[in-house]
Amino acid sequence: TPLRIHLVDNPPLFAWVEKEYFDFTGDKRRLNHLLNEKRYLQKHFKWFARAKAGERFECSPQRIYLNSIGDDGFTWTGRASGMDNTPRGRDAGGYHKALWVDAISQQALSAHCIATMEQALGNENEARKWNAEYEALKKKINHLYWDERDGFYYDVTIADKQPCRVKTIASYWPLLARIASREQARSMVNHLMNPGEFGGSYPTPSLARSDKDYHHQTGDYWRGGIWLPTTYMAIKAIEKYGYHEEADAIAEKVINQQLAAYRNMEPHTVWECYSPSGDAPSTEHGRRVRPEFCGWSALGPIALFIENVLGFKKVSAAGKEVRGRLKKKKGRHGIRNLRFGDIVTDIVFDGKGTVSVTSNASYSLIINGNTYSVRKGDTEIKL
């Protein structure tokens, strides 16, 4: 059957996904096919950059909502952005009257990832070109979307380029794209950890608790609901600036909420999104959200558990390395059959000071900032 796409103008995350996939596989043939032979990622970037609302494609029943406003960014909608009933655009007079900070930041992230992958292929000229694209977007975002008064990235009005002071989790996309300075990142982390905004016992609500449209009891979907895709994004975003303790703490709270909801609610399942005030699913228009939603909510018990609870943060098949943060307070823990490239390894920390590693090939294991050489066979590391 022909390809069918519900919303063509959903977030442009293909380049980020391919860069993460390359980290695991080291597959340069795939990169060459994507970037040199077909140029899929570049074409999608350029299409997104020039998109006009109302366009229609045979593969989708929907006209696109995304609208490019020159170099300043994009208008978007709740549905197309993925944040269906978000109150963003409230201060501007509607979705179509605001420039969306996540759209332009995701484009910057794409440019950065394309440049990184071109560099991996040895395409220096292309890497420079995409780095220049990234730097231009970075400059624009910091000039137009950063609000010095609140120390926060906001959507802005098209009419007078003033901040739309609706704090949402979407404002952490600039950090994932490494747009923020150290000082800007510190301010954003303060907002993220503030119990009156995005922190507390149930962190990363989609809308700040201080907002007048925040729905305390259930989150009412994107009016405070906790969504694993944006939670994962925010956690990875602050890690870019070294806030690992804060990232790990957020991850553990969210996973514990998922576990409690799984145990205590009927049916015992993984939910589409969660309440910002209790161990329960969120609601949409008064109805409980969808069950059996591993499509993205499994980011918690899989990705965040491995990366932020166990502490195995990053792999590089091309660089033959694993990066992690191991903590004695967690006791004995580790991972078995971790695969990246052609390497398969077990890494087990006894919780006291010894890491036992088994591998089918040599690689570098970077733990808590220190580099250790792992050989083929068994290796014992004293921390």
Where are the language model's segments positioned?
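Extended, well-ordered alpha-helical scaffold segments
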Residues: K28-A51, S110, I114, L121-N142, ...
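Conserved helix-loop functional segments at active or binding sites
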Residues: E20-D23, A120, K140-H143, D147
